[in-house]
């Protein structure tokens, strides 16, 4: 399909949503003359912000909201689905052709792609890579799962500067011929088991970041590679990494040892990172800078000055000498465990706010941090029942609240000067919030109200 062919086709956007991806997709199609129908199970009132942002195209759009119409799926030349819609959806079975915003973008894109996936750490890593590359490549772009559809800046691409894409397993699922110049898998934990029938299917989708790569390198954590990805073939050169001394030196590998970074046996630089949760993204970013011949002194300054990104172990405020951290993006237990370990020192106590919607995950890893948490403050939800079971097995006291407001107020009430209140839910957000970002914003507003 060529760009000039869009105007001759009937498109159906399945899932306008509230996070901007559906709007960017719709704008791209409308700008290129598509005949467009937008359908979403949410109501017009729920989608008001997204609909308002498309008002200048009102005469070109037909909306079907609060339901789906089978005839729309039968008539459309191309259905562009939200990545979270499962491929076996009954409506998609009626479609002649199904794409996503990412797969559609890749049809037209000519820029070289650096692709990043992984269960956790993706957004932190792509943010670091973007900062590292923009000095050498002023027209570098960043998009994907970080909240910016690459279709939103398609017309600004020059065909040669690097494009950094953060990709979730759902986004990778539909990509059959994806061929980046450099691909990265930060880590793999159990996640989205409410979406996948088994963990192997999750791994298969993650592997699509590199299986069709024809050149360049793929960077994978050594333990994850040997456990999950060594069975997949690719023409890309595999380079492993380890945040500690490597478990195997038979393949090319970079790793950190007491702040020094080695590639195989060669020292390539050094940096220090005290927070466990930032160690892997910073280590990978440092090596990518080395691999792409980016000034390592420049890279060192970026790593030194990097304070994280919103919603990922984000320092919010100091209130009466109590520190508040927003870690709403921790939607699995392993991520919350890392966050607690990152903040815990001998001089502070952590009051942990946790709980939410279950994703069919195992919370037994919480046993690793039971003795690191001063108070367990739980928000009601389907996942919270599982957390309670883990705590009760260890005879740990906990407090359950019906609202985030109640949890925040109680955490502040019991905190002593020097304590940390960490909001790291280890769960999805859908029972009480629109999404995890809405949840994080509400947490920050509540903290602001404390003083």
Swiss-Prot record:
GO biological process, any: cell wall organization
Binding-site list for ATP: 118-124
Originating gene: murD
Subcellular location, record wording: Cytoplasm
Keyword field: ATP-binding, Cell cycle, Cell division, Cell shape, Cell wall biogenesis/degradation, Cytoplasm, Ligase, Nucleotide-binding, Peptidoglycan synthesis
Purpose of the protein: Cell wall formation. Catalyzes the addition of glutamate to the nucleotide precursor UDP-N-acetylmuramoyl-L-alanine (UMA).
Keyword Transcription regulation among record annotations: no
Pathway: Cell wall biogenesis; peptidoglycan biosynthesis
Coiled-coil residue spans: none
Family: Belongs to the MurCDEF family.
Protein name according to UniProt: UDP-N-acetylmuramoylalanine--D-glutamate ligase
Leader peptide range in chain numbering: none
GO CC term (a single one): cytoplasm
Enzyme class: ligase
InterPro entries, per database record: Mur-like_cat_sf, Mur_ligase_C, Mur_ligase_C_dom_sf, Mur_ligase_cen, MurD
EC number, UniProt record: 6.3.2.9
Pfam family of the protein (one): Mur_ligase_M
Catalysed reactions, as listed in the record: UDP-N-acetyl-alpha-D-muramoyl-L-alanine + D-glutamate + ATP = UDP-N-acetyl-alpha-D-muramoyl-L-alanyl-D-glutamate + ADP + phosphate + H(+)
Gene Ontology terms for molecular function: ATP binding; UDP-N-acetylmuramoylalanine-D-glutamate ligase activity
